[in-house]
Regions:
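Positively charged n-region of N-terminal signal peptides that target proteins for export
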Residues: 1-4
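Hydrophobic h-region of N-terminal signal peptides that target proteins for export
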Residues: 8-18
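The canonical Cys-X-X-Cys-His
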Residues: 36, 40-50, 102
């Protein structure tokens, strides 16, 4: 019983530290210098897996590896910004440059070889409208 309590306590501490690290990573002031690969590693691979092959279990996490839907650069950009189903929106957490960087990384890696890239100015068109509390 004591071992079980210890395992649960250590798991909770590890989870809290991981959530804190993710929250720190998403701070726009600190994250402006990160690469698309780093964004993928810290944000995307938790669900889509390090190899981009996705997962099925408690939920369905689509594969990004060898994904023909990524042929249209707008598709992953819209998904990152707006989310869909279990995929959360990252429009408030990521800048236009960060969205472009992570989309370009995924489209050029993980078995994908799309060479056309998005620029930060392309991302603005895909952003959802600002809510009243974001305007302030």
């Amino acid at each position: 019983m004591k071992a079980f309590v210890l395992i649960v306590a250590l798991s909770a501490i590890g989870t809290a530290q991981a959530q804190s690290a993710d929250a720190d990573f998403l701070d726009r002031k600190d994250a402006t210098h990160v690469t698309g690969q780093q964004i993928f590693t810290h944000i995307c691979q938790g669900c889509h897996m390090a190899d981009g092959k996705g997962a099925v279990g408690a939920g369905h996490y689509p594969a990004l590896a060898n994904n023909p839907k990524l042929a249209a650069a707008a598709y992953p950009a819209v998904m990152v910004l707006n989310g869909r189903g279990a995929m959360p929106s990252f429009s408030r957490e990521l800048t236009d440059a960060q969205v472009a960087d992570v989309v370009n990384y995924v489209r050029g890696h993980l078995g994908n070889a799309y060479t056309d890239t998005l620029k930060p100015e392309d991302i603005k068109a895909f952003r959802p409208p600002a809510t009243p509390d974001e305007d302030n």
